[in-house]
Amino acid sequence: MVYSYTEKKRIRKDFGKRPQVLDIPYLLSIQLDSFQKFIEQDPEGQHGLEAAFRSVFPIQSYSGNSELQYVSYRLGEPVFDVKECQIRGVTYSAPLRVKLRLVIYEREAPEGTVKDIKEQEVYMGEIPLMTENGTFVINGTERVIVSQLHRSPGVFFDSDKGKTHSSGKVLYNARIIPYRGPWLDFEFDPKDNLFVRIDRRRKLPATIILRALNFTTAQILDLFFEKVVFEIRDNKLQMELVPERLRGETASFDIEANGKVYVEKARRITARHIRQLEKDGIDRIEVPVEYIAGKVVAKDYVDASTGELICAANMELSLDLLAKLSQAGHKQIETLFTNDLDHGAYISETLRVDPTSDRLSALVEIYRMMRPGEPPTREAAENLFENLFFSEDRYDLSAVGRMKFNRSLLRDEIEGSGILSKEDITEVMKKLIDIRNGRGEVDDIDHLGNRRIRSVGEMAENQFRVGLVRVERAVKERLSLGDLDTLMPQDMINAKPISAAVKEFFGSSQLSQFMDQNNPLSEITHKRRISALGPGGLTRERAGFEVRDVHPTHYGRVCPIETPEGPNIGLINSLSVYAQTNEYGFLETPYRRVRDGVVTDEINYLSAIEEGNFVIAQANSNLDDEGRFLEDLVTCRSKGESSLFSREQVDYMDVSTQQIVSVGASLIPFLEHDDANRALMGANMQRQAVPTLRADKPLVGTGMERAVAVDSGVTSVAKRGGTVQYVDASRIVIKVNEDEMHPGEAGIDIYNLTKYTRSNQNTCINQMPCVNLGEPIERGDVLADGPSTDLGELALGQNMRVAFMPWNGYNFEDSILVSERVVQEDRFTTIHIQELACVSRDTKLGPEEITADIPNVGEAALSKLDESGIVYIGAEVTGGDILVGKVTPKGETQLTPEEKLLRAIFGEKASDVKDSSLRVPNGVSGTVIDVQVFTRDGVEKDKRALEIEEMQLKQAKKDLTEELQILEAGLFARIHAVLVSGGIEAEKLSKLPRERWLELGLTDEDKQNQLEQLAEQYDEMKSEFEKKMDAKRRKITQGDDLAPGVLKIVKVYLAVKRQIQPGDKMAGRHGNKGVISKINPIEDMPYDENGTPVDIVLNPLGVPSRMNIGQILETHLGMAAKGIGEKINAMLKKQEEVAKLREFIQKAYDLGDNVCQKVDLSTFTDDEVLRLAENLKKGMPIATPVFDGATEKEIKELLQLGGLPTSGQITLFDGRTGEQFERQVTVGYMYMLKLNHLVDDKMHARSTGSYSLVTQQPLGGKAQFGGQRFGEMEVWALEAYGAAYTLQEMLTVKSDDVNGRTKMYKNIVDGDHRMEPGMPESFNVLLKEIRSLGINIELEEE
């Protein structure tokens, strides 16, 4: 493999045995592609805004004299960029402008004669835009729209599995689900009648809907039944015989023909009898007259002479009726063929319970069911039925629905109309009856072929359509009312309903979620999440076990591991690494094509439906060099089952071993050795890891780390190759390679880095350059590391030296013992940034004022504020300190004489305002790193606001000027080259000022043209700079758009440095989590023979019962990696020759059995080898891909190469006594994470605080500064001990005895430790409640 200069800095040794056939796809494409589809112009109008407009427009007036037509739309430029939107707390969005055409027709003239056309562009609200990382900035916070897994539109056949009826009879049903419109359900009842429900209303006999579709009884019977024809000849009754229909019946008479008895009376008819009848060609037999009694007539029979109806269709025949029919001259009688086995008389029975007889009565019945209480008229009933399933405005199956519908009914074409037809409804009923008759299967609702993904774009389009439909009504009204001559499209469209619908979706939909921004992995996982909840989806309470379970079709589409624990388990899933959605929204996964037992590199994406028809081999099947399967029998999956197939039968093979898992699970090394429950916890806990101060790449990884770090968008990635021309903490400048430049540009790329910004979870986002000056860069190289990334690889935690052993009970119940060295080296120190806001409003009594002049506050408290009353940057503050001084006017109160005197002496100020300053919350301390002041338009800015503005302007100017200088330098370098090649000496040029170069003339015409082009570019650059500067100046100096009634907002950002301490939660990547019990001095920690103490001691009992052996293998492999690093370090210290170093590193990379990765260090220069060695000396990073990882043998070989015992265990000594421990201990390096469950956020102790109004008991919870609840079980405990006084104290003065507690407070202050308990307030509440029931209860004092 060819490595770029940057990649050569540190190469991860890969133990993967299977070659990577398919690169890992861009991990955020599900979000970006979907939204792109929504906003891009689509000429066909299949999806996105275009589809929404086309489905609603043109809007015609009620009279038909005018219509409003849609022409096109365009999205404007957003006012602020993403960062500005976050700072200002506004939505990152673009204005939508739509070109509409109002066409007015002549009234008297023939149809279609146009009188007038007016075209105009109309503003239709703002559409939030997606940032390049797949998020939305809504009101200043980053949000993610989670994709939804919902039931695909189409038709589904299902059964109740015998749960509905007490007899356990299985009742079948069919349900037609449209994309929008009413559902249509058909269901059997226990008596085998077929019923229909429209939109889950009351059920009606299913034949009503057929009558409403204009079918007569005879036509209905004709549709659903085969016929048996009886013929009356010479007073004998003959029956047309279809032998196959007799199977399984018992003959009620001798079946004979041509004098031969085929079946004797009362014998069961078998397949042998049927074959005999068919062989002899018997197609007609004589039957006794009684046989016809009870058969059902298939059509109406009328007496031709009198016109009288003898018997109607669906009537049972009797011998009397037969005689009448014979008299009237009917020689042939058609009856329905039914039996109990596989031709039930369901529709015939249903017709008997059907109260309607013709179309009108059926329509009226449907109208009564849909609109109870309204008087039905013929017109209303017809309209209602038409609009239910046959109107394109109200009903839409969608392309997916039609495709699923036609496939389910086994039709050939998959396209068609979005509304239902007669045939659609009758065929669904036929298939349902077939299933009831035992032909055909019910659908599996949890099959991924029946559930589809609805992503951002589609959901936004639906919301947008909802808004448009609301506007449509208003437009129709206006078109009918207004004076059309003066009316313009602008006057008819009100953008409010549209923007309200869109705003509501992005702001408060259940699927629009506050982005989980703990670390890069949690961001990526959140964007790839798939939820079955949300509007139109399931609810937690109703979702059963089946929906949540892993289904065979999840393979390669949805991760079977990563899902939350708790009530949402199985309802929220994660997309597998290689999965993507197809045009219909179904998930598909890639497979390699297999032809005649040879695996090709051709890759096909298959959806769950298509996959069912193939035999698919596992990714770990063994192949020879030509790609043939080595074994004759290969383990494969087919139709959801796994079994052995011969190699010729195989159609496809998995692409990769990590195909089945999600991104989160694919980062767990040795996942194959972990129990699934623990792997689930491991995958979930990686998302909660807090970015540490110094990121440390995992020694044992899976090779997915780079993909996650780059795709998450937290790193800065080179867009084009070049050379690093300038680098500092906040910007990187790349001089682009000549061959990658666009004509007519300076060829300079500038990357500005994000510095110390707050994330959604209050962690710190900060980018640091990881390239040096003059280094060559290729496209896609990582230039700067973000939070939790190290040299472009994901680094969520730290590599810690761990020992598995008990240590004085400090690791009881998963507790973790940590060495003090970990704290001293700041291994798990994290920075958290908190945003505190102070809002100054306009109150009824006057405006609140932000000022340093606060009543009743000492000098000391104001020492950190400037003259505007705002804390200065860099101040170190603790709980209770004032950050922003603010006073609120308070109402006039009746003053006491003393106060009046004071006011007379000292003036007004003190008492008409109260202190409402912003203070640091209790238990928080940190450093102020930034202050922002937002002032309403028209309100005078205070001194601090002006200072900040000045600073921002200076910074913006400096940035833009530097940018311009860099671009100028690049441009003048090219001008210099042109001039020198044009014959002008370089020395002369150096004496001229640069601006004069452009005035020089060259004899060579080509060169002169080039020079003129460059001069043009220079002018353009200058004017562009001026424009940018003006825009920046405008943005910075303009007032802010604040909520009504708000005058000023001051935001203060506090950075809090948190070291690791007892009570913090830590975890490995295998679900091995625990709480730190003690920080132990280094000298007390166990140490090895070299005197190296361990960092962390873990409990060995945490492994066997949990079955996550992956952590042990990781520990061993980590030790080996570290051992090799130490050997390299020793060689570097000795300053060995580069050749020896190269040889040793090459040996390490070559280790392993038929490993795919080939690293050839002979192609590296000596400097590159030294730089590689420098990066490897802390340990050689290793990748062990999921299900394709390092074997036990390889781990032992690596340990040996690192000069370590192959058992992975070493002798340790007790740090306190220096004695050797009795047996050897497993010691190694494990990657440990610090999770975002920090004791600082949870610890809380109440002194005195607020009380509940009714019960007067202290509130609960940290947010309310509440107390600890002493509940009834605790009361029982004290009662059991007979601790009467303690109990009394708990229930009175420590809780809700109002007088007692104030008195006690006074006593304690006076040094008198007595208490006098009185009546608890809750007892009074109880009395009041009893009185409210009408029982008078009074307390009498003795």
Swiss-Prot record:
It catalyses: RNA(n) + a ribonucleoside 5'-triphosphate = RNA(n+1) + diphosphate. It comes from the Bacteria. GO terms for molecular function: DNA binding; DNA-directed RNA polymerase activity; ribonucleoside binding. One of its GO terms (biological process) is DNA-templated transcription. Gene3D superfamilies: 2.40.50.100, 2.40.50.150, 3.90.1100.10, DNA-directed RNA polymerase, beta subunit, external 1 domain, DNA-directed RNA polymerase, subunit 2, domain 6, RNA polymerase alpha subunit dimerisation domain, RNA polymerase Rpb2, domain 2. Keywords: DNA-directed RNA polymerase, Nucleotidyltransferase, Transcription, Transferase. The keyword Iron-sulfur does not apply. PROSITE patterns: RNA_POL_BETA (PS01166). Belongs to the RNA polymerase beta chain family. The RNAP catalytic core consists of 2 alpha, 1 beta, 1 beta' and 1 omega subunit. When a sigma factor is associated with the core the holoenzyme is formed, which can initiate transcription. DNA-dependent RNA polymerase catalyzes the transcription of DNA into RNA using the four ribonucleoside triphosphates as substrates. This is DNA-directed RNA polymerase subunit beta. It comes from Yersinia pestis bv. Antiqua (strain Angola).
